[in-house]
Amino acid sequence: MTTRTPSSGWLSRLAQGSLVKQILIGLVLGVLLALVSKPAAIAVGLLGTLFVGALKAVAPVLVLMLVMASIANHQHGQKTSIRPILFLYLLGTFSAALTAVLFSFLFPSTLHLTTAADSITPPSGIVEVLRGLLMSMVSNPIDALLNANYIGILVWAVGLGFALRHGNDTTKNLINDVSHAVTFIVKVVIRFAPLGIFGLVSSTLATTGFETLWGYAQLLLVLVGCMLLVALVINPLLVFWKIRRNPYPLVLTCLRESGVYAFFTRSSAANIPVNMALCEKLNLDRDTYSVSIPLGATINMAGAAITITVLTLAAVHTLNIPVDLPTALLLSVVASLCACGASGVAGGSLLLIPLACNMFGIPNDVAMQVVAVGFIIGVLQDSCETALNSSTDALFTAAACMAEDDQLAKNALRG
C-alpha cells in the first residue's frame, strides 16, 4: 500500500486546478507586490521573462512539427477548413479597420507631437512591406527557426509535409510522435502561466506605472473601446454568420483562455502554443488548426488595423487635414493590408503608421512623432492589440470548424 505525502497531494491539486483561477490569483498578487515593494516587483519580473521566453522558444518548433505532421499524415479526400478561416481573417481585419475609422470620426483625438523616434526606420511603402513578406517566405529554415520567422517556418513546414506524404509509414509515425512530444512540452510550459503573469504584472507596474498614460486618456479610450467593440460585437456577428447559433459562449471562451494570456505576454508568437491547446480542448480538426493558428499569428491583425487607423487619423485631426468618405474607406483598405504585413516588419503595427500617414501627405518626421506616441501608450495599446489578434485566431478557427461539423458546434463548449 502506497501513501501520498501532503506535499505531493498539494502539487497534484495545483497541477490539475483551474488555470484561469490561478492566473487571476497571480494577477492580484502581482498588483499587490508592485504596490508594496517596487524592488521586489522588479526582481520577480524574471519569472515573467522566463515564461515568455519559454513560450517563444517552443513555438517555432511546435509550428514546424505540427504543420509538417498534419500535412504528411493528411488522408486524400479529408476535408479541412483553411479557406473559410482565411476569408474570416481578412474580413475581420477589414471590419476592424472600418470600425476604427468610424470611432475616430465620432470621437476625434489629437496628439502632442513633440518628440520623434529618429532611430527607427519604417518601411517606405506597401511594396516594401510586401517585399519583406516575400523575402520571409524564402528564408533559410534554420534561420527561420532561430528568428521565429513564422512565414518562413510555414513555407518550409508545408513543403516538407507535402514531400513526406510519399514517405513510408515509419517516417510519418516518427514525425507524429515528435509533434505529440512537443505538444506535451507546451502543456508543461503553460502550467507555469500563473507564475509568469505574476512576474509580468508586478514588473510592468513597478517600472512603468500608468501615470504616463493619463495624458493620452482619450486616445486610449478610442483605441481600447474600438478593440472591445470588435471583440464583443463585430467578431460575434461574424461567428454567428458562420455557425448560426449563439456565438458568445465561444467568444468568451476564446477571450478567457487565449486573450488573457496574450494580454500579458504581448506576443502573438508566444500565444501560438496557448491557441493550439485551446483548439485541442475544443476538439477541433488538428489538420486545420495546426495550419490556421500560426497563419493567423502572421496575417490576422484586427488589433493592428485599429492601431494604424486610429493613430493615423489622430495625426490627421491634429494637423487639421480634411478627410472625405472615399479617402477614409481607402485608409481602411491600406490599414488592413499594412496590418496583414505587420508580422514582416520589425516593430509591428506602429512602424507601419508612417505608411498610412503618407496617404495624407504627412511628413515622415511628423509621422515618426506619431510612432513615438504609440510607444508611450504601448503598455496598454500593445497588450489589448495582441489579446484581440491572438484570441481571434482561435475564435475564427473554431467558428469555421464548427460550421463544417454541426455535432462539434453542439458539443464543443459543453463542460
Swiss-Prot record:
Q: Name one GO cellular component term.
A: plasma membrane
Give the primary localization class.
Answer: membrane
Intracellular or extracellular location(s): Cell inner membrane
GO function term, MF aspect, one: neutral L-amino acid:sodium symporter activity
Q: Which UniProt keywords apply?
A: Amino-acid transport, Cell inner membrane, Cell membrane, Membrane, Symport, Transmembrane, Transmembrane helix, Transport
Q: Which reaction does it catalyse?
A: L-serine(in) + Na(+)(in) = L-serine(out) + Na(+)(out); L-threonine(in) + Na(+)(in) = L-threonine(out) + Na(+)(out)
Q: Report how it sits in the membrane.
A: Multi-pass membrane protein
BP GO terms, sorted: serine transport; threonine transport
The UniProt transmembrane annotation reads 23-43, 47-67, 85-105, 144-164, 181-201, 220-240, 293-313, 333-353
Q: Which family does it belong to?
A: Belongs to the dicarboxylate/amino acid:cation symporter (DAACS) (TC 2.A.23) family.
The record's annotation in PANTHER family points to: PROTON/GLUTAMATE-ASPARTATE SYMPORTER, SERINE_THREONINE TRANSPORTER SSTT
Function (record text): Involved in the import of serine and threonine into the cell, with the concomitant import of sodium (symport system).
Q: What is this protein called?
A: Serine/threonine transporter SstT
| Organism field | Klebsiella pneumoniae subsp. pneumoniae (strain ATCC 700721 / MGH 78578)
